[in-house]
Amino acid sequence: MRDILIGGAWPYANGSLHIGHIAALLPADVLARYHRAAGDKVCYVSGSDCHGTPVAIRARQEGKTPEEISSRYHREFAECFRKLGFSYDYYGRTSSEEHKEFVKEFHKKLYESPFVYEKEVPQAYCENCGSFLADRFVTGTCPECGGEARGDQCDACGTVLEAESLENPVCAVCGSEISFRSSRHLFIALGRMEQELKNWVESHENWRKNAQTFSERYIKEGLRDRALTRDLDWGIEVPHAGYENKKIYIWAENVLGYLSSSRAALKDNPEAFRQLWGLDGEKQCEDEKTEIRHYYVHGKDNIPFHTIILPALLIANGDGWRLPDEIISSEYLTLEGKKISTSRNYAVWVKDIVDRYDGDSLRYYLLANGPEKKDADFSWREFVNSHNGELLGAYGNFINRSLVFIQKYLGGTVPEGIPNQELRAETNRLYASVGEQIEKGRFKDALDDIFEFVRKANKYFDSRQPWITRDTDQKDCADTLYNCVQLIAGLAVLLYPFLPFSSERVCGWLQLSPEWKRQQVEPGYRLPEIQVLFQRLDKSWWRKKMKVWKEPVRAEADVAG
């Protein structure tokens, strides 16, 4: 048994989720469901990022408080994740008392570190808005590549920036020119940790290529010290004398949500929390040590915050927190060949699609066709085809034709039969290979292998022709259907991490547990009433979706329905 932490990135609570968010976060749920089925102790956490200027600006636009805005989207996020089957052990929010209390404790210790110091720096100020601006709300020209960039990061080249380094900076809220005012802040000396971080990054060849490449490039360019505090109204108070009117910079507290939420998830067992984070490792005898693994799942725009910023904070704090083991960083998802744009409402909003379509349909499409290794495109036509062709036509068809045949011709009872050793051996092999692929973050390969086995199962049914042998060779017919039931049992468990809704239904029909091993359905078991697993989607309706985006849109509208 292993101790597993799985952290999904925390979405900003200033607007609705779109399918690009889900494409990046969904692998975390596959990992959580698999590791639980494999018998590991899992702590799967995430939450809503409620602080920072994006939320404050949305609140100002709507005439509400930041707390009201973040609470609304937090509730919406939690409901969307529930409808998509995300099995969080704890889904929190950065505005919760639990998170704020933990962050203050962490930062108090952090400020005692030799890596933290004070410095007077220029901070972006917009005269028109009458407020200081977070770096992400300053736009201008990137000094590295010449592209349009925000004050915190250039999406074009991936460089982590400071607002004052931009050329021709303007306020992203109102478009006015900005000035920079001197302000005293706490800084973390990333430059002094550069060699330690470099050695750590280079020791993780298991990371996805984008995580390795981006992280190595950031370090090679030279890590710049970053401010831990900012002149903001909405955020967590700085636990340091003289900083009563400032807030902890959002990047220095939101990544600590993995720590605060796992502590909340394990509040009844504080020793388990300490063990999960390696804080009591020295107290354990070598032969008693539990294997621990931490996964962080997010989009590639969040890579530096998980491979540089979070490790730097954990190191500087000095308490011995475990650093990330696995970085599962997805590429970008486009929509019908174009970049998703929330400002133009060119997106598929999760709150709409989950109310109309089966959660497993979206899960399957994004896992089988998502941006795992390279940018991927969401196409309504292909979404329909993948549902009708793979889920309904291959997997659902095999289950339905097999179980309905038993109900119709064999009295609804699983028959006695001789196990097919080749199929049994392949099922066992799949449990091993699919588990290994999931642990290495190769979800598409794992799903492809399972569906190749689905196609083999359908071929087995066709080649055995039970619709003929039920009249000509009842023993052969019984053998066929017995083995088909065992195949269904194997497929339901293998697909459980990917397609939990349909797998739970099949496991219920056959009285199976999601335990990660080949399971047997005994002869004589009487089947309950079997219903269709997936409904066919109308091939014509994707054209209606395309028509929506040919018309002007201004706000979050119902573009998914």
Regions found by a protein language model. Name each.
Residues 30, 68-79, 105, 394-401, ...:
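A non-catalytic, amphipathic alpha-helix used as a structural packing/dimerization or gating element
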Residues 139, 194, 347, 380, ...:
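Residue-level signal for cytosolic alpha-helical hairpin/rod architecture
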